[in-house]
């Protein structure tokens, strides 16, 4: 999301609880998600001024962090071991990235889905889905347990209900899975591959669906979590080994952990950026959380307060993640 994609919203004042460099427990209450929570502070991992960092994905095979700058029109591959970041320009806004092989990844551009060579940046068309929808672009996307890419579209001017979520196979077969969405975001599956969670940001909700791994279809939609506007707007999402949900909070300076069974907020990671967009568990043991942020949609005061906005951050949340699914025809 960026300034072109938010509705005019009036946020109630929200006071972040300060904490030291080490994890520190605190009690924070909100209207909907009342709970005692552990608050942790994220630290700077890589300084960069991305306009709209998104698409967080940890490649466990290469131990690299894949991410995109949507408005900057770049795919990034960051290596924490060397603190280096490789960048590939894209011909239009790039909404998400998921690795396919050691040298290829699937990316979502404005006019369709492409395979990019992560050695030389060359791209090849896979699906022309929504090519005729020139007022739309693609946003967040992830792969299901069967290896299909699920990616959502949105209107460039955030007109409500103009987007859809599509399932795209490695051969390019495209199926519409969800329609009438506004700002398509966070997509994750539980480790037993029976539940799919999804975010349409302006709703302030995380929706749950039953997932059938035999047919790669969803059913039985219901609301798992309702997020108060006081803490921000739900953006990208990751899932941990306990099937708890980690959500980047746009306008919220944080990543929050939610229990989808109870709807409660369990913990929070404070991030020194106003707009937190996405996160992914990484590291050799999947015990670190890498976080993307945006440098757009801030007042002058907010820009001065968060000079590192747009950078990558990292935190140690105290729980481990799970390996994310690659784009592949193999389960």
Label every PLM stretch briefly.
Residues 74-76, 112-114, 163-166, 205-207, ...:
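A short loop-to-beta-strand structural motif that recurs across blades of beta-propeller domains
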Residues 30-50, 78-83, 89, 127-128, ...:
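A short helix->beta-strand "capping" segment at the edge of beta-propeller domains
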Residues 20-22:
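Bacterial signal peptide processing site
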Residues 123-179:
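Hydrophobic alpha-helical segments and helix pairs
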Residues 209-217, 316-322:
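Short loop/turn segments immediately following beta-strands, especially the blade-tip
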Residues 15-18:
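C-terminal motif of bacterial Sec signal peptides marking the signal peptidase cleavage site
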Residues 59-60, 65-70, 106-111, 149-159, ...:
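Conserved beta-strand positions in repeat-built beta-propeller and related beta-rich domains
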Residues 48-62, 91-109, 132-148, 177-195, ...:
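Beta-rich, blade/repeat-based domains predominating
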């Amino acid at each position: 999301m960026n300034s072109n994609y938010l509705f005019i919203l009036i946020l109630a004042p929200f006071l972040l609880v300060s904490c030291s460099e080490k994890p520190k427990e605190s009690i924070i209450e909100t209207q909907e998600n009342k709970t005692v929570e552990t608050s942790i502070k994220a630290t700077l991992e890589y300084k960069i001024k991305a306009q709209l960092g998104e698409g967080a994905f940890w490649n466990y095979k290469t131990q690299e962090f894949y991410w995109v700058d949507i408005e900057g029109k770049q795919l990034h591959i960051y290596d924490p071991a060397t603190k280096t970041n490789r960048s590939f320009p894209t011909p239009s806004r790039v909404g998400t990235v998921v690795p396919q092989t050691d040298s290829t990844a699937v990316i979502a551009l404005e006019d369709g889905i492409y395979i990019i060579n992560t050695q030389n940046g060359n791209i090849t068309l896979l699906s022309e889905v929504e090519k005729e929808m020139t007022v739309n672009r693609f946003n967040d996307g992830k792969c299901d347990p069967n290896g299909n890419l699920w990616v959502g579209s949105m209107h460039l001017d955030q007109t409500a209900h103009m987007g859809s979520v599509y399932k795209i196979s490695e051969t390019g077969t495209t199926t519409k899975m969800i329609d009438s969405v506004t700002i398509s975001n966070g997509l994750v599956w539980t480790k037993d591959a029976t539940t799919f969670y999804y975010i349409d940001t302006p709703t302030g909700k995380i929706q749950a669906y039953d997932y059938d791994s035999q047919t790669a279809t969803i059913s039985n939609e219901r609301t798992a979590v309702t997020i108060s506007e006081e803490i921000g707007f739900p953006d990208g999402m990751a899932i941990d080994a306990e099937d708890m949900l980690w959500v980047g909070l746009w306008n919220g300076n944080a990543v929050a952990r939610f229990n989808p069974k109870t709807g409660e907020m369990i913990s929070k990671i404070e991030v020194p950026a106003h707009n937190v967009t996405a996160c992914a568990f990484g590291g050799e043991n999947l015990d670190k959380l890498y976080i993307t942020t945006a440098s757009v949609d801030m007042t002058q005061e907010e820009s001065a307060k968060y000079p590192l906005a747009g950078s990558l951050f990292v935190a140690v949340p105290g729980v481990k993640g799970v390996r994310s699914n690659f784009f592949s025809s193999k389960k």
